[in-house]
Amino acid sequence: MIDMEVGIVGGGLAGLVAAISLVEKGVDVSIIGPKSKDSNSYLAQAGIAFPLVEGDSIRIHVLDTIRAGKYINDEEVVWNVISKSTEAYSFLVSHGVTFTGNELEGGHSHPRVFTIKSETGKHVIPILEKHARELGVNFVRGFVEEIGIKNGKLAGVFLNGELLKFDAVVVATGGFSGLYRFTAGVKENIGLLIGDLALKGVPLRDMEFVQFHPTGFIGRRTYLITEAVRGAGAKLVTGDGERFVNELETRDVVARAIYLKMLEGKGVFLDARGIEDFKDRFPYVYSVLKKEGIDPGKDLIPVTPVAHYTMGGISVDIFYRTRIRGLYAIGEAASNGFHGANRLASNSLLECVVSGLEVARTILREEPKRGANDAPYNFDELGDVDSIREIMWNHAGIVRDKSSLLEGLKKLEGVEADQRLKVVAKAVLTLALEREESRGSHYRRDFPFMRKEFERPSFFHLNV
């Protein structure tokens, strides 16, 4: 046994991989958070991008990633993550994951997205959670209210007002797409701990880059129609049958094209009637649509863009370290330049596995010790989250401009909500206002082109 206690906040793919990797080396590990089924990883349909098919290569996958990220990716990070794809694949397979096929998705040069019946997360997460339990990972169910930090030193995490002390804490809570009115992800993913750390002096990175999935379906709740459906040949059309975009363009391009058609008052539909084996290839999507009274073999599927993934988050280095010793962030909660201005489809789960493996190595190498024995507790009420969601959707959405962003910032001041949620929203609005160009998922109608002077990452840092 290694004399070190590690707390991982969040039990999605990144958190589970980190926990398994650490406990296998004799570290005392606890995962604190809701059930793993309540994570965006569990909802992931399409799969995981691995450059392992014939004709593909790490270099080609790197180039696809940087092209999608509109050239502000950290190239060292991109190479680091994708060069570890074989290790990531081997980790999953050795722990019982069996992929059933591979698909082509938008922005990819090859069909490198490895999937399990197009409901990948639903299969991978239970397998890894079972392994984690068998290995002795301690699962603590609950809602972590804040990270315990005193004078810049880590003490642990607060759960129901009680400080749980750890030598190292890994934030693996996911992103903040739940701060938007329409999202197909977990509504509870509102970026609370991202804002918490910002208020405690930890920089945030690239917060203006929010990816909107082009093909959300709003029924009894909001669902995603996986990108792989378009990869299999489905077409995007208006109500009168007009095709208006290359369906396999990157998500930012497709989402914006759909949104602009909707602004013209036109409905947009996915025509999947030409996919003969739809039910077998996409069983989850098929079952959802049938319950909503839509037969994808006969009917057009109404779609709309929805907030899906946040490229920004807690600023970390290539080893997933924050500026506070012993505090790390991985997966969607973290941002180190892997995705740039726009995430390439199915790169997120690859990042989850690689960041989980990498942060475990970092912790084992550094062997951090708890820096403080107590910390102030400030959590109160979340407050009016829905008003923030409306502001984000209306003022920091798919199409932005100066006047709308300024109006959003002004409205935000009057919202009575947790300051940590407000600072997440403020970071998005502020960095979107400062970035006077359009790049990737960030589109300014008043600055509709990329500009060389903005070919760099963005940082949001409060002086505390």
UniProtKB/Swiss-Prot annotation:
Keywords: Cytoplasm, FAD, Flavoprotein, Nucleotide-binding, Oxidoreductase, Pyridine nucleotide biosynthesis. Its cofactor is FAD. The keyword Nucleotide-binding applies. It catalyses: L-aspartate + O2 = iminosuccinate + H2O2. Binds 1 FAD per subunit. GO terms for biological process: NAD biosynthetic process. This is L-aspartate oxidase. It comes from Pyrococcus abyssi (strain GE5 / Orsay).
